[in-house]
Amino acid sequence: MRQTSGRVLAHCLRLWKEWGQGSMNNTQSKTLLTEGSIWRKMVVFALPLFFGNLFQQLYNTADSLIVGNFLGSNALAAVSSSGSLIFLLVGFFNGIAMGAGVVIARYYGAREINELQKAIHTTVVFGILCGLVLMTAGLILAPQILIWMRTPKEVLPESTAYFRVYFIGSLAFVLYNNFVGILQSVGDSRHPLYYLIFSSAVNIVLDLLFVGVLHFGVASAAAATVISQFVSAALCLYRLMYKSPDD
């Protein structure tokens, strides 16, 4: 755990060092919000955030479209019944990641190494704990949550199966949002979007394979989403741990 967060800190420090040396320019992946035109920098930084939120919703949308076409209306209802709660969870953890990013950006900009290290460690550990708690709660409480949401009885079994498999991947989307928050806090909002677009494509391909070709059922659509979310989280973690800021 400390080794992982230490590598993340090392990445941030490499960015900081090159920033201090003035070796970074506008063609690089990092957007320096303190230099150049304010409006242009805001647009360049904010557009990936907007499209990132859009593509995060594409997971459930793709599941609904593919399941509805291959498995029928009941299966579509089973997937769609969880859409609002998934939207709420994504928004909630996006907010937490943004809050953590503000703290990290502050210490990064002030060059307070010790506080930056603590903030990164706390963000990573908190994300893992939240993911595990959410996974456990989802596995246990999925049927009751769906009943509270007034899910029709005829689709409740399939909806519960989808929901439980989706919650198994809670750790992936929580960590993804945390890693994105760290990257964005040092000015890189584009690479998380690239990874999310790629993982969305992976999700669609796996949906078609699991549901359309192998006929595994509604739960397999959730499994496709979980796999693709782990892909996006792993790509973000790889960039934080191993890639140079200029890559």
PLM regions: where:
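Hydrophobic transmembrane alpha-helices of multi-pass small-molecule transporters
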Residues: 88-91, 203-207, 233-237
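Interfacial/gating helices of multi-pass transporter permease domains
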Residues: 44, 67-87, 154-158, 218-219
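Helix-terminus/linker motif at the lipid-water interface of multi-pass membrane proteins
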Residues: 54, 58-77, 146-153, 209-216
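Small-residue-rich hydrophobic transmembrane alpha-helices
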Residues: 76-136, 173-192
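Alpha-helical transmembrane segments of multi-pass membrane transporters/permeases
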Residues: 127, 182-206, 223-226
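Short alpha-helical transmembrane segments in multi-pass integral membrane proteins
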Residues: 2-46, 104-171, 213-247
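Transmembrane alpha-helix boundary and packing residues in multipass membrane permease domains
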Residues: 49, 53, 65, 102, ...
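Residue-level signal for short hydrophobic patches within transmembrane helices
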Residues: 39-58, 62, 85-92, 168, ...
